Amino acid sequence: MRTLTIFFISLFSLPLALNAQSVDEMLQKVSAAIEAGQNGQAVSYFRQTIPLNIDRTEMYYWTNVDKNSEISSKLATELALAYKKKRNYDKAYLFYKELLQKDPNNVDCLETCAEMQVCRGQEKDALRMYEKILQLDADNLAANIFLGNYYYLMAEQEKKS
């Protein structure tokens, strides 16, 4: 019985050990590709590590990536997209804010950041971002829809009170 228990424990823990090893190996490949100047390959390896262990991949980004390098924006975008897909809006917002620090007038990034704020329940901050988007791009559909709906609902609430 004891042998059988040990067998099952080792059987179930083996994939965890292999997963950790493969994440480390992939992150080493990311580092090697960055050092070799192969940014496209580095982003590809980085993207492959995210589903294996997103927390370890994020830690790699914060500790090993030069935030002033060209590739840091691409890696931050990958993490932002992954967290958005997992509906972890707090982390996605964090990475979109990181991207906005480098390019504060990037309309696409502002739009997604505002969307994350709505998902996080931060409508006032989203309102400010959508207003900034309209200053940069008056024809932005998402900003016009959000602001139109927001001001309509505010007027309706004011009528009721």
Task: Indicate residue ranges for each PLM-predicted region.
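Register position in tetratricopeptide repeats
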Residues: 35, 85, 119-120, 153-154
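Canonical tetratricopeptide repeat
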Residues: 61-64, 74, 78, 112, ...
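Short coil/turn linking the two alpha-helices of tandem helical-hairpin repeats
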Residues: 57, 121, 153-159
